[in-house]
From Swiss-Prot:
Keyword Methyltransferase (UniProt): yes
Lineage: Bacteria, Pseudomonadati, Pseudomonadota, Alphaproteobacteria, Hyphomicrobiales
Gene name for this UniProt entry: rsmG
Protein name as catalogued: Ribosomal RNA small subunit methyltransferase G
Keywords: Cytoplasm, Methyltransferase, rRNA processing, S-adenosyl-L-methionine, Transferase
InterPro entries recorded: rRNA_ssu_MeTfrase_G, SAM-dependent_MTases_sf
Transmembrane parts of this sequence: none
GO molecular function term, any single one: rRNA (guanine-N7-)-methyltransferase activity
PANTHER family the record matches: S-ADENOSYL-L-METHIONINE-DEPENDENT METHYLTRANSFERASES SUPERFAMILY PROTEIN (PTHR31760:SF0)
Family classification: Belongs to the methyltransferase superfamily. RNA methyltransferase RsmG family.
Species this chain originates from: Agrobacterium fabrum (strain C58 / ATCC 33970) (Agrobacterium tumefaciens (strain C58))
A Pfam entry, by short name: GidB
Catalytic activity: guanosine(527) in 16S rRNA + S-adenosyl-L-methionine = N(7)-methylguanosine(527) in 16S rRNA + S-adenosyl-L-homocysteine
């Protein structure tokens, strides 16, 4: 099996397939994604999420914000399971979605834990990390506010955000309050989309 042109082991493929089946089952009663996108689970959600880990397999301690249906957090945790190392802390304040995430992690053997708290208070519980991810959550300025506590604790922190075609306007807006280094990775899924890699985040004084 290949995802985004990269080979995936049989073990990881089986974990991903089990996650997708769980997702379909839970989506009938818990609104994880729009029903209209269920036919594109692999191409639109799994593969899009897998880009995060494929771009940066080195970080061993991740935080995924607004994890929702597990994209990209559970997908990253599944890839880490193959390595037998690393961890993803998934932050999701919706109790139903948090319950799904717990079951997904347990049944796939993925390496992670779920924290049913608001993002604004997550840094009080999870004090350190190497990398942060978020998908379809908020604009960059707000995301930077969320991750700033971890950036202060770890100058080497990297963040990875899936963004659509309007990302340039978000970048310009964020420059008003923040200094940061930016690498734009073209999405392997959608021509107009990117994965933004953020480092050296500092609040302007």
């Amino acid at each position: 099996m290949k995802i985004n042109g990269q080979s995936v082991s049989r073990e990881t493929q089986e974990r991903l397939e089990h996650f997708v089946e769980l997702f379909k089952k839970w989506n009938k009663t818990t609104n994880l994604v729009a029903p209209s996108t269920l036919t594109e689970l692999w191409s639109r959600h799994v593969a899009d999420s897998a880009q995060i880990f494929q771009l940066s397999p080195q970080p061993k301690k991740w935080i995924d914000l607004g994890s929702g249906g597990g994209f990209p957090g559970v997908i990253t945790a599944i890839f880490l399971a193959e390595l037998g190392d690393g961890w993803v802390d998934l932050v999701e304040s919706n109790n139903k979605k948090a319950a799904f995430l717990r079951i997904a992690l347990k049944e796939t053997g993925a390496r992670g834990a779920v924290h049913p708290v608001r993002i604004e208070t997550a840094s009080e519980i999870i004090t350190t990390c190497n990398a942060v991810s978020a998908r379809a959550l908020a604009d960059l300025d707000l995301l930077f506010g969320y991750i700033h506590p971890w950036a202060q604790n770890n100058p080497n922190l990297k963040a990875y955000f899936n963004k659509g075609r309007d990302y340039d306007s978000e970048v310009q807006k964020a420059h008003g309050r923040w200094q940061f280094d930016l690498i734009k990775h073209r999405s392997a899924i959608e021509a107009d989309s990117v994965v933004l890699e953020i480092s050296n985040l500092v609040l302007r004084r």
